[in-house]
Swiss-Prot record:
Name of the protein in question: Eukaryotic translation initiation factor 3 subunit D-2
Compositional bias annotation for Basic and acidic residues: 133-145
Region (RNA gate): 287-301
Subunit structure: Component of the eukaryotic translation initiation factor 3 (eIF-3) complex. The eIF-3 complex interacts with pix.
Entry's family note: Belongs to the eIF-3 subunit D family.
Keyword Ribonucleoprotein part of the UniProt annotation: no
Length: 545
Protein backbone atom coordinates (compact mmCIF):
# COMPACT_ATOMS: atom_id res chain seq x y z
CA UNK A 1 0.00 0.00 0.00
CA UNK A 2 2.90 2.33 0.75
CA UNK A 3 4.21 1.99 -2.82
CA UNK A 4 1.14 3.54 -4.36
CA UNK A 5 0.81 7.22 -5.13
CA UNK A 6 -1.32 9.13 -2.68
CA UNK A 7 -4.74 10.34 -3.78
CA UNK A 8 -5.03 14.10 -3.70
CA UNK A 9 -8.53 15.49 -3.66
CA UNK A 10 -8.97 18.08 -6.45
CA UNK A 11 -9.94 21.59 -5.54
CA UNK A 12 -13.39 22.54 -6.78
CA UNK A 13 -14.47 26.11 -7.26
CA UNK A 14 -17.56 26.75 -5.18
CA UNK A 15 -19.64 29.86 -5.57
CA UNK A 16 -21.33 30.60 -2.28
CA UNK A 17 -23.12 33.78 -3.41
CA UNK A 18 -24.62 32.86 -6.76
CA UNK A 19 -25.02 30.43 -9.61
CA UNK A 20 -22.19 29.96 -12.09
CA UNK A 21 -18.45 30.49 -12.02
CA UNK A 22 -16.77 32.46 -9.31
CA UNK A 23 -16.26 36.16 -9.69
CA UNK A 24 -12.54 35.92 -8.94
CA UNK A 25 -11.11 34.61 -12.19
CA UNK A 26 -7.52 33.95 -12.99
CA UNK A 27 -6.13 37.24 -14.22
CA UNK A 28 -2.67 35.82 -14.94
CA UNK A 29 -3.73 33.87 -18.03
CA UNK A 30 -3.11 35.94 -21.21
CA UNK A 31 -5.88 36.20 -23.78
CA UNK A 32 -5.28 34.33 -26.99
CA UNK A 33 -7.52 35.37 -29.90
CA UNK A 34 -9.19 32.52 -31.70
CA UNK A 35 -11.59 31.87 -34.52
CA UNK A 36 -14.44 29.38 -34.33
CA UNK A 37 -14.10 28.64 -38.03
CA UNK A 38 -10.53 27.28 -37.65
CA UNK A 39 -10.29 23.76 -38.99
CA UNK A 40 -9.98 20.91 -36.48
CA UNK A 41 -7.30 19.30 -38.62
CA UNK A 42 -4.89 21.98 -37.46
CA UNK A 43 -3.84 19.71 -34.56
CA UNK A 44 -2.37 17.23 -37.04
CA UNK A 45 0.35 19.73 -37.90
CA UNK A 46 2.09 18.92 -34.60
CA UNK A 47 2.77 15.25 -35.32
CA UNK A 48 3.45 15.11 -39.07
CA UNK A 49 5.15 17.37 -41.59
CA UNK A 50 2.78 19.25 -43.89
CA UNK A 51 2.06 17.52 -47.19
CA UNK A 52 0.40 20.47 -48.89
CA UNK A 53 2.92 22.40 -50.95
CA UNK A 54 0.66 24.68 -52.95
CA UNK A 55 -1.66 25.53 -50.06
CA UNK A 56 0.58 24.88 -47.07
CA UNK A 57 -1.07 27.49 -44.89
CA UNK A 58 -4.70 26.58 -45.46
CA UNK A 59 -5.18 25.73 -41.74
CA UNK A 60 -3.56 28.89 -40.44
CA UNK A 61 -5.86 31.09 -38.40
CA UNK A 62 -6.47 34.59 -39.63
CA UNK A 63 -6.21 35.90 -36.06
CA UNK A 64 -2.97 36.86 -34.43
CA UNK A 65 -1.12 37.62 -37.67
CA UNK A 66 -0.57 41.22 -36.72
CA UNK A 67 1.16 42.82 -33.74
CA UNK A 68 -1.98 44.71 -32.92
CA UNK A 69 -3.41 41.52 -31.34
CA UNK A 70 -0.19 40.41 -29.58
CA UNK A 71 -0.12 40.25 -25.80
CA UNK A 72 2.59 42.10 -23.87
CA UNK A 73 2.66 41.61 -20.08
CA UNK A 74 4.42 44.82 -19.23
CA UNK A 75 3.59 47.94 -17.30
CA UNK A 76 5.59 50.25 -19.51
CA UNK A 77 3.40 53.07 -20.77
CA UNK A 78 5.50 53.40 -23.91
CA UNK A 79 3.87 50.26 -25.30
CA UNK A 80 0.42 51.85 -25.25
CA UNK A 81 -0.88 52.52 -28.75
CA UNK A 82 -4.20 53.06 -30.49
CA UNK A 83 -5.86 50.40 -32.56
CA UNK A 84 -5.28 50.77 -36.29
CA UNK A 85 -8.69 51.34 -37.92
CA UNK A 86 -7.42 51.72 -41.47
CA UNK A 87 -8.34 48.14 -42.27
CA UNK A 88 -6.64 44.80 -41.96
CA UNK A 89 -6.42 42.40 -44.84
CA UNK A 90 -6.62 39.04 -43.20
CA UNK A 91 -5.63 35.69 -44.56
CA UNK A 92 -7.91 34.32 -47.21
CA UNK A 93 -8.88 30.76 -46.28
CA UNK A 94 -8.44 27.87 -48.62
CA UNK A 95 -11.09 27.63 -51.32
CA UNK A 96 -11.37 24.60 -53.48
CA UNK A 97 -11.61 25.38 -57.17
CA UNK A 98 -10.98 29.06 -56.65
CA UNK A 99 -8.85 29.54 -59.78
CA UNK A 100 -11.05 27.48 -62.04
CA UNK A 101 -13.22 29.19 -64.63
CA UNK A 102 -16.96 28.87 -64.84
CA UNK A 103 -17.15 25.97 -67.26
CA UNK A 104 -20.92 25.96 -67.47
CA UNK A 105 -21.22 29.61 -68.51
CA UNK A 106 -17.96 29.91 -70.44
CA UNK A 107 -18.69 30.10 -74.17
CA UNK A 108 -15.14 29.02 -75.04
CA UNK A 109 -15.63 25.55 -73.51
CA UNK A 110 -19.01 24.79 -75.01
CA UNK A 111 -17.49 23.23 -78.06
CA UNK A 112 -15.35 20.89 -75.95
CA UNK A 113 -18.01 19.91 -73.44
CA UNK A 114 -20.71 19.48 -76.04
CA UNK A 115 -23.10 21.88 -74.29
CA UNK A 116 -24.38 24.69 -76.45
CA UNK A 117 -24.12 23.97 -80.13
CA UNK A 118 -22.15 26.01 -82.61
CA UNK A 119 -24.12 28.43 -84.72
CA UNK A 120 -23.48 29.98 -88.06
CA UNK A 121 -21.20 32.98 -88.25
CA UNK A 122 -19.86 34.98 -91.13
CA UNK A 123 -19.11 32.43 -93.79
CA UNK A 124 -19.67 29.29 -91.73
CA UNK A 125 -19.90 27.76 -88.29
CA UNK A 126 -18.14 29.56 -85.46
CA UNK A 127 -18.12 28.11 -81.95
CA UNK A 128 -18.63 30.39 -79.01
CA UNK A 129 -21.41 32.50 -80.47
CA UNK A 130 -24.80 32.00 -78.82
CA UNK A 131 -28.04 31.42 -80.65
CA UNK A 132 -29.51 34.65 -79.28
CA UNK A 133 -26.69 36.66 -80.86
CA UNK A 134 -27.83 36.03 -84.41
CA UNK A 135 -29.08 38.85 -86.54
CA UNK A 136 -31.98 38.57 -88.92
CA UNK A 137 -29.49 38.02 -91.76
CA UNK A 138 -28.04 34.91 -90.13
CA UNK A 139 -24.73 36.53 -89.24
CA UNK A 140 -23.11 36.34 -85.84
CA UNK A 141 -22.39 39.45 -83.83
CA UNK A 142 -19.01 40.96 -84.58
CA UNK A 143 -17.02 41.07 -81.35
CA UNK A 144 -13.77 42.31 -82.81
CA UNK A 145 -14.43 45.84 -81.57
CA UNK A 146 -14.88 44.62 -78.00
CA UNK A 147 -11.93 42.20 -78.14
CA UNK A 148 -9.59 45.01 -79.15
CA UNK A 149 -10.19 46.82 -75.85
CA UNK A 150 -9.49 44.08 -73.34
CA UNK A 151 -7.37 44.64 -70.26
CA UNK A 152 -8.06 48.39 -70.16
CA UNK A 153 -6.71 49.15 -73.63
CA UNK A 154 -9.12 51.87 -74.70
CA UNK A 155 -9.49 53.34 -78.14
CA UNK A 156 -6.96 56.01 -79.11
CA UNK A 157 -7.95 59.52 -78.09
CA UNK A 158 -9.08 61.72 -80.95
CA UNK A 159 -7.59 65.18 -81.03
CA UNK A 160 -10.31 67.65 -81.94
CA UNK A 161 -9.78 71.09 -83.39
CA UNK A 162 -10.85 74.21 -81.53
CA UNK A 163 -13.71 76.32 -82.85
CA UNK A 164 -11.38 79.30 -83.20
CA UNK A 165 -7.61 79.57 -83.48
CA UNK A 166 -6.10 81.08 -80.33
CA UNK A 167 -3.69 83.83 -81.28
CA UNK A 168 -0.53 84.82 -79.51
CA UNK A 169 -1.82 88.29 -78.54
CA UNK A 170 -4.79 86.85 -76.63
CA UNK A 171 -4.49 87.00 -72.84
CA UNK A 172 -5.79 84.07 -70.82
CA UNK A 173 -7.87 85.29 -67.87
CA UNK A 174 -9.49 82.21 -66.39
CA UNK A 175 -9.57 78.44 -66.81
CA UNK A 176 -12.45 76.61 -65.14
CA UNK A 177 -12.76 72.84 -65.28
CA UNK A 178 -16.10 71.07 -65.35
CA UNK A 179 -15.94 69.59 -61.81
CA UNK A 180 -15.79 73.13 -60.43
CA UNK A 181 -18.69 74.24 -62.61
CA UNK A 182 -20.81 71.29 -61.51
CA UNK A 183 -20.56 72.45 -57.90
CA UNK A 184 -22.04 75.89 -58.63
CA UNK A 185 -25.65 76.67 -57.78
CA UNK A 186 -27.92 79.70 -57.92
CA UNK A 187 -31.26 78.67 -56.40
CA UNK A 188 -34.55 80.52 -56.20
CA UNK A 189 -34.32 82.20 -59.61
CA UNK A 190 -37.87 83.30 -60.36
CA UNK A 191 -39.65 82.75 -63.65
CA UNK A 192 -38.78 85.33 -66.28
CA UNK A 193 -41.21 88.12 -67.01
CA UNK A 194 -42.24 89.07 -70.53
CA UNK A 195 -41.02 92.46 -71.69
CA UNK A 196 -41.84 92.31 -75.41
CA UNK A 197 -43.55 89.63 -77.53
CA UNK A 198 -43.55 89.67 -81.31
CA UNK A 199 -44.19 87.38 -84.27
CA UNK A 200 -46.92 84.92 -85.19
CA UNK A 201 -47.37 81.18 -84.60
CA UNK A 202 -49.23 78.51 -86.53
CA UNK A 203 -51.21 75.70 -84.91
CA UNK A 204 -49.86 72.18 -84.57
CA UNK A 205 -51.30 69.42 -86.77
CA UNK A 206 -52.38 66.64 -84.40
CA UNK A 207 -52.37 64.02 -87.16
CA UNK A 208 -48.60 63.78 -86.73
CA UNK A 209 -49.14 62.30 -83.26
CA UNK A 210 -50.53 59.15 -84.92
CA UNK A 211 -47.47 58.50 -87.05
CA UNK A 212 -45.62 55.22 -86.47
CA UNK A 213 -43.06 53.10 -88.26
CA UNK A 214 -45.68 51.34 -90.38
CA UNK A 215 -47.36 54.65 -91.20
CA UNK A 216 -44.36 56.86 -91.86
CA UNK A 217 -44.45 60.17 -93.68
CA UNK A 218 -41.80 61.66 -95.93
CA UNK A 219 -40.07 64.79 -94.72
CA UNK A 220 -40.77 67.66 -97.09
CA UNK A 221 -38.46 70.56 -97.81
CA UNK A 222 -39.67 74.07 -97.12
CA UNK A 223 -38.69 77.35 -98.74
CA UNK A 224 -39.65 79.52 -95.79
CA UNK A 225 -37.01 81.94 -94.53
CA UNK A 226 -35.62 82.06 -91.00
CA UNK A 227 -33.39 84.84 -89.70
CA UNK A 228 -30.62 83.85 -87.28
CA UNK A 229 -29.93 87.22 -85.72
CA UNK A 230 -27.21 87.61 -83.16
CA UNK A 231 -27.67 89.57 -79.95
CA UNK A 232 -26.17 92.83 -81.17
CA UNK A 233 -28.03 92.67 -84.51
CA UNK A 234 -31.46 92.25 -82.93
CA UNK A 235 -33.36 95.57 -83.20
CA UNK A 236 -35.55 94.78 -80.17
CA UNK A 237 -32.55 94.09 -77.93
CA UNK A 238 -30.94 97.31 -79.12
CA UNK A 239 -34.07 99.17 -78.12
CA UNK A 240 -34.36 97.47 -74.73
CA UNK A 241 -30.67 97.96 -73.89
CA UNK A 242 -31.28 101.70 -73.60
CA UNK A 243 -33.85 101.37 -70.81
CA UNK A 244 -33.63 98.10 -68.84
CA UNK A 245 -31.18 95.32 -68.18
CA UNK A 246 -27.41 95.02 -68.17
CA UNK A 247 -26.92 91.46 -69.53
CA UNK A 248 -28.25 90.68 -73.02
CA UNK A 249 -28.26 87.32 -74.82
CA UNK A 250 -30.33 84.81 -76.81
CA UNK A 251 -31.71 81.49 -75.64
CA UNK A 252 -29.26 79.52 -77.83
CA UNK A 253 -26.27 81.27 -76.25
CA UNK A 254 -27.63 80.87 -72.72
CA UNK A 255 -28.37 77.18 -73.28
CA UNK A 256 -24.87 76.60 -74.62
CA UNK A 257 -23.28 78.15 -71.54
CA UNK A 258 -25.67 76.49 -69.08
CA UNK A 259 -25.08 73.03 -70.57
CA UNK A 260 -21.36 73.45 -71.16
CA UNK A 261 -20.48 70.60 -68.76
CA UNK A 262 -22.15 68.10 -71.13
CA UNK A 263 -20.36 69.20 -74.29
CA UNK A 264 -17.40 67.50 -75.94
CA UNK A 265 -16.98 69.58 -79.09
CA UNK A 266 -15.40 73.01 -79.02
CA UNK A 267 -17.54 76.16 -79.19
CA UNK A 268 -17.07 79.83 -78.33
CA UNK A 269 -19.15 82.79 -77.14
CA UNK A 270 -18.13 86.46 -77.31
CA UNK A 271 -18.61 88.77 -74.31
CA UNK A 272 -18.74 92.48 -75.21
CA UNK A 273 -18.44 94.59 -72.05
CA UNK A 274 -19.44 98.24 -72.38
CA UNK A 275 -19.60 100.02 -69.04
CA UNK A 276 -21.79 97.95 -66.74
CA UNK A 277 -23.47 96.13 -69.65
CA UNK A 278 -22.46 92.84 -71.22
CA UNK A 279 -23.65 91.51 -74.59
CA UNK A 280 -23.29 87.76 -75.10
CA UNK A 281 -22.86 87.24 -78.81
CA UNK A 282 -21.60 84.75 -81.39
CA UNK A 283 -18.92 85.29 -83.97
CA UNK A 284 -19.70 86.02 -87.59
CA UNK A 285 -19.25 83.08 -89.97
CA UNK A 286 -19.21 80.68 -87.03
CA UNK A 287 -20.83 77.24 -86.86
CA UNK A 288 -22.67 78.08 -83.68
CA UNK A 289 -26.16 77.45 -85.13
CA UNK A 290 -25.34 73.95 -86.40
CA UNK A 291 -26.68 71.01 -84.38
CA UNK A 292 -24.24 68.33 -83.33
CA UNK A 293 -24.90 64.62 -83.92
CA UNK A 294 -23.71 61.88 -81.55
CA UNK A 295 -21.48 64.34 -79.74
CA UNK A 296 -21.47 62.44 -76.44
CA UNK A 297 -21.43 58.91 -77.90
CA UNK A 298 -18.70 56.45 -76.99
CA UNK A 299 -17.73 56.37 -80.66
CA UNK A 300 -18.57 59.74 -82.25
CA UNK A 301 -18.58 60.10 -86.04
CA UNK A 302 -15.20 59.99 -87.72
CA UNK A 303 -13.92 63.19 -89.28
CA UNK A 304 -13.50 61.92 -92.84
CA UNK A 305 -13.25 64.55 -95.53
CA UNK A 306 -15.98 64.26 -98.15
CA UNK A 307 -18.00 61.69 -96.20
CA UNK A 308 -21.72 62.15 -95.64
CA UNK A 309 -21.23 60.82 -92.09
CA UNK A 310 -18.56 63.27 -90.99
CA UNK A 311 -19.40 65.51 -88.00
CA UNK A 312 -19.77 68.62 -90.17
CA UNK A 313 -21.96 66.89 -92.77
CA UNK A 314 -24.16 65.37 -90.08
CA UNK A 315 -24.49 68.76 -88.38
CA UNK A 316 -25.64 70.36 -91.63
CA UNK A 317 -28.09 67.51 -92.19
CA UNK A 318 -29.51 67.72 -88.64
CA UNK A 319 -29.97 71.49 -88.91
CA UNK A 320 -31.83 71.15 -92.20
CA UNK A 321 -34.03 68.36 -90.76
CA UNK A 322 -35.01 70.50 -87.77
CA UNK A 323 -35.83 73.46 -89.98
CA UNK A 324 -38.07 71.38 -92.24
CA UNK A 325 -39.69 69.32 -89.49
CA UNK A 326 -40.77 72.21 -87.26
CA UNK A 327 -42.62 73.77 -90.24
CA UNK A 328 -44.12 70.60 -91.72
CA UNK A 329 -45.97 69.57 -88.53
CA UNK A 330 -47.85 72.90 -88.48
CA UNK A 331 -51.10 73.71 -90.25
CA UNK A 332 -49.94 76.33 -92.71
CA UNK A 333 -51.71 78.00 -95.56
CA UNK A 334 -54.75 80.13 -94.83
CA UNK A 335 -55.33 78.65 -91.38
CA UNK A 336 -55.64 81.02 -88.45
CA UNK A 337 -52.50 82.02 -86.58
CA UNK A 338 -51.73 83.13 -83.08
CA UNK A 339 -50.55 86.74 -83.15
CA UNK A 340 -48.31 88.27 -80.52
CA UNK A 341 -48.52 91.91 -79.46
CA UNK A 342 -45.99 93.20 -81.99
CA UNK A 343 -45.19 92.00 -85.52
CA UNK A 344 -41.87 90.47 -86.37
CA UNK A 345 -39.38 93.37 -86.75
CA UNK A 346 -37.84 91.96 -89.93
CA UNK A 347 -41.13 91.04 -91.59
CA UNK A 348 -41.27 92.05 -95.25
CA UNK A 349 -44.08 91.94 -97.75
CA UNK A 350 -43.84 89.06 -100.19
CA UNK A 351 -41.40 87.10 -98.01
CA UNK A 352 -42.67 83.84 -96.54
CA UNK A 353 -41.21 83.66 -93.04
CA UNK A 354 -41.26 80.65 -90.78
CA UNK A 355 -43.74 80.27 -87.95
CA UNK A 356 -41.87 81.62 -84.96
CA UNK A 357 -42.73 83.77 -81.99
CA UNK A 358 -40.22 85.65 -79.86
CA UNK A 359 -40.43 86.45 -76.17
CA UNK A 360 -38.00 88.98 -74.74
CA UNK A 361 -37.92 88.03 -71.06
CA UNK A 362 -36.32 89.51 -67.97
CA UNK A 363 -34.65 87.68 -65.06
CA UNK A 364 -33.24 89.05 -61.83
CA UNK A 365 -30.05 87.13 -60.98
CA UNK A 366 -29.25 89.15 -57.86
CA UNK A 367 -26.45 91.62 -57.15
CA UNK A 368 -28.06 94.14 -59.56
CA UNK A 369 -27.75 91.75 -62.51
CA UNK A 370 -30.79 91.97 -64.80
CA UNK A 371 -30.78 89.53 -67.72
CA UNK A 372 -32.69 90.26 -70.93
CA UNK A 373 -32.89 87.28 -73.28
CA UNK A 374 -34.68 86.53 -76.52
CA UNK A 375 -36.56 83.23 -76.39
CA UNK A 376 -38.70 81.60 -79.05
CA UNK A 377 -41.67 79.29 -79.68
CA UNK A 378 -42.25 77.22 -82.81
CA UNK A 379 -45.99 76.65 -82.64
CA UNK A 380 -49.16 76.60 -80.57
CA UNK A 381 -51.64 73.89 -79.66
CA UNK A 382 -55.27 74.03 -78.62
CA UNK A 383 -55.50 72.47 -75.17
CA UNK A 384 -58.29 70.16 -73.93
CA UNK A 385 -59.99 73.07 -72.15
CA UNK A 386 -59.58 75.50 -75.02
CA UNK A 387 -56.40 77.11 -73.65
CA UNK A 388 -53.44 77.95 -75.85
CA UNK A 389 -50.28 75.91 -75.25
CA UNK A 390 -46.95 77.04 -76.67
CA UNK A 391 -44.67 74.45 -78.27
CA UNK A 392 -40.95 74.01 -78.82
CA UNK A 393 -40.52 71.63 -81.76
CA UNK A 394 -37.28 69.73 -82.36
CA UNK A 395 -36.23 66.61 -84.29
CA UNK A 396 -33.77 63.79 -83.66
CA UNK A 397 -32.30 62.16 -86.74
CA UNK A 398 -31.01 58.66 -87.43
CA UNK A 399 -28.21 58.41 -89.95
CA UNK A 400 -26.75 54.88 -89.76
CA UNK A 401 -27.54 52.61 -86.83
CA UNK A 402 -24.71 50.18 -87.63
CA UNK A 403 -22.07 52.86 -88.00
CA UNK A 404 -23.23 54.68 -84.86
CA UNK A 405 -23.55 51.43 -82.85
CA UNK A 406 -27.08 52.34 -81.72
CA UNK A 407 -30.55 50.83 -81.86
CA UNK A 408 -32.31 50.54 -85.19
CA UNK A 409 -35.35 52.79 -85.02
CA UNK A 410 -37.52 50.89 -87.48
CA UNK A 411 -37.32 47.78 -85.28
CA UNK A 412 -37.47 49.31 -81.79
CA UNK A 413 -39.32 52.62 -82.06
CA UNK A 414 -42.88 51.26 -81.90
CA UNK A 415 -42.29 48.61 -79.24
CA UNK A 416 -39.37 50.03 -77.24
CA UNK A 417 -39.46 53.78 -77.75
CA UNK A 418 -38.14 54.26 -74.21
CA UNK A 419 -34.97 52.36 -75.09
CA UNK A 420 -34.54 54.49 -78.21
CA UNK A 421 -34.89 57.68 -76.18
CA UNK A 422 -32.40 56.38 -73.61
CA UNK A 423 -29.93 55.68 -76.41
CA UNK A 424 -30.38 59.21 -77.75
CA UNK A 425 -29.90 60.66 -74.27
CA UNK A 426 -26.61 58.82 -74.10
CA UNK A 427 -25.40 59.79 -77.58
CA UNK A 428 -26.81 63.35 -77.73
CA UNK A 429 -26.89 64.40 -74.08
CA UNK A 430 -25.64 67.92 -74.75
CA UNK A 431 -28.06 68.64 -77.60
CA UNK A 432 -31.11 67.39 -75.70
CA UNK A 433 -30.07 69.36 -72.62
CA UNK A 434 -29.81 72.55 -74.70
CA UNK A 435 -33.26 72.00 -76.17
CA UNK A 436 -34.67 71.46 -72.70
CA UNK A 437 -33.08 74.64 -71.35
CA UNK A 438 -34.39 76.64 -74.32
CA UNK A 439 -37.90 75.30 -73.66
CA UNK A 440 -37.69 76.13 -69.96
CA UNK A 441 -36.41 79.65 -70.63
CA UNK A 442 -39.11 80.42 -73.18
CA UNK A 443 -41.85 79.00 -70.96
CA UNK A 444 -43.07 76.44 -73.49
CA UNK A 445 -45.83 74.14 -72.28
CA UNK A 446 -44.62 71.17 -74.33
CA UNK A 447 -41.45 69.99 -76.02
CA UNK A 448 -42.31 68.10 -79.20
CA UNK A 449 -39.64 65.65 -80.37
CA UNK A 450 -39.74 64.07 -83.79
CA UNK A 451 -37.84 60.97 -84.91
CA UNK A 452 -36.59 61.42 -88.46
CA UNK A 453 -34.57 58.78 -90.30
CA UNK A 454 -32.97 58.41 -93.68
CA UNK A 455 -34.84 56.45 -96.31
CA UNK A 456 -31.67 54.46 -96.86
CA UNK A 457 -28.45 54.94 -94.87
CA UNK A 458 -26.45 55.92 -97.96
CA UNK A 459 -28.80 58.78 -98.94
CA UNK A 460 -28.56 61.88 -96.75
CA UNK A 461 -31.05 63.93 -98.77
CA UNK A 462 -34.28 61.93 -98.34
CA UNK A 463 -35.84 61.41 -94.92
CA UNK A 464 -39.04 60.08 -93.35
CA UNK A 465 -40.83 60.88 -90.07
CA UNK A 466 -41.22 57.73 -87.94
CA UNK A 467 -42.72 59.01 -84.70
CA UNK A 468 -43.40 62.06 -82.54
CA UNK A 469 -43.25 62.37 -78.77
CA UNK A 470 -44.05 65.16 -76.34
CA UNK A 471 -42.75 66.11 -72.90
CA UNK A 472 -43.23 68.84 -70.35
CA UNK A 473 -39.92 70.74 -70.18
CA UNK A 474 -39.74 70.86 -66.38
CA UNK A 475 -40.46 67.15 -66.01
CA UNK A 476 -38.10 66.23 -68.84
CA UNK A 477 -35.28 68.21 -67.22
CA UNK A 478 -35.73 66.10 -64.08
CA UNK A 479 -35.63 62.88 -66.12
CA UNK A 480 -32.34 63.79 -67.78
CA UNK A 481 -30.84 64.99 -64.47
CA UNK A 482 -30.61 68.61 -65.57
CA UNK A 483 -30.42 71.04 -62.65
CA UNK A 484 -31.53 74.56 -63.48
CA UNK A 485 -29.97 75.80 -60.24
CA UNK A 486 -26.60 74.59 -61.48
CA UNK A 487 -27.27 76.08 -64.93
CA UNK A 488 -28.02 79.50 -63.45
CA UNK A 489 -24.97 79.17 -61.19
CA UNK A 490 -22.65 78.57 -64.16
CA UNK A 491 -24.04 81.61 -65.98
CA UNK A 492 -23.79 83.83 -62.92
CA UNK A 493 -20.18 82.74 -62.25
CA UNK A 494 -19.03 83.68 -65.76
CA UNK A 495 -20.91 86.99 -65.64
CA UNK A 496 -19.24 87.89 -62.34
CA UNK A 497 -15.80 87.14 -63.79
CA UNK A 498 -16.37 89.34 -66.85
CA UNK A 499 -17.92 92.12 -64.72
CA UNK A 500 -14.64 92.47 -62.83
CA UNK A 501 -12.70 93.02 -66.06
CA UNK A 502 -12.25 96.37 -67.83
CA UNK A 503 -14.29 97.27 -70.88
CA UNK A 504 -13.42 95.26 -73.96
CA UNK A 505 -14.09 92.05 -75.82
CA UNK A 506 -13.70 88.60 -74.24
CA UNK A 507 -14.00 85.11 -75.66
CA UNK A 508 -15.29 82.07 -73.75
CA UNK A 509 -14.15 78.87 -75.47
CA UNK A 510 -14.68 75.21 -74.67
CA UNK A 511 -11.38 73.37 -74.81
CA UNK A 512 -11.54 70.86 -77.68
CA UNK A 513 -9.80 68.03 -75.82
CA UNK A 514 -10.21 68.79 -72.10
CA UNK A 515 -13.31 69.19 -69.90
CA UNK A 516 -12.84 72.88 -69.22
CA UNK A 517 -13.68 76.35 -70.51
CA UNK A 518 -11.18 79.15 -71.06
CA UNK A 519 -11.78 82.91 -70.96
CA UNK A 520 -9.55 85.12 -73.12
CA UNK A 521 -9.12 88.86 -73.43
CA UNK A 522 -9.10 89.48 -77.19
CA UNK A 523 -8.55 92.67 -79.22
CA UNK A 524 -11.53 94.62 -80.51
CA UNK A 525 -10.76 93.73 -84.14
CA UNK A 526 -9.99 90.07 -83.46
CA UNK A 527 -12.91 88.70 -85.52
CA UNK A 528 -13.36 91.40 -88.14
CA UNK A 529 -13.02 90.23 -91.73
CA UNK A 530 -12.08 92.19 -94.80
CA UNK A 531 -15.63 92.08 -96.17
CA UNK A 532 -18.29 91.93 -93.48
CA UNK A 533 -21.11 91.63 -96.01
CA UNK A 534 -19.95 88.22 -97.21
CA UNK A 535 -21.75 85.26 -95.69
CA UNK A 536 -20.28 81.85 -95.12
CA UNK A 537 -21.66 78.71 -96.73
CA UNK A 538 -23.20 77.67 -93.41
CA UNK A 539 -25.20 80.88 -93.01
CA UNK A 540 -26.33 80.75 -96.65
CA UNK A 541 -27.44 77.21 -95.96
CA UNK A 542 -29.53 78.29 -92.98
CA UNK A 543 -31.09 81.27 -94.75
CA UNK A 544 -31.95 79.49 -97.99
CA UNK A 545 -33.41 76.32 -96.54
Amino acid sequence: MSGRAPFIKPVLEYNEHGWGPCEELSVDVPYQPFCKSDRVGKISDWTAPPTERKFANKYVSSFGNSNQYAYFHEDDESTYHLVDTSGFKGFRPFQRGRFRGNIRNNPRTRGRTGRGGAVTGIGGNQPGVGVNERTKYGKGRDNRRQMGRRFGRNAPTRMRESSVVVRSDWVSIEEIDFPRLLKLSLPNVKEGQDVVTCGSLEYYDKTYDRINVKNERPLLKTDRIIHTLTTTDDPVIRRLSKTIGNIFATDEILATIMCCTRSNYSWDVVFDKVGNKIFLDKRDNAQFDLLTVNETALEPPLDEEGSINSPHSLAMEATLINHNFCQQVLRGGDQKKYQFEEPYPLEESGVDLVSIGYRYKQWDLGNNIILIARCKHNGVLQGPNGEVQFLSIRALNEWDSKASNSLEWRQKLDTQHGAVLASELRNNACKLARWTVESVLSGSDQLKLGYVSRVIPRDHLRHVILRTQQFKPQEFSTQINLSMDNAWGILRCLIDIVMKQPDGKYLLMKDPNKPMVRLYDVPENAFESSDEDDLSDDKLFLLSN
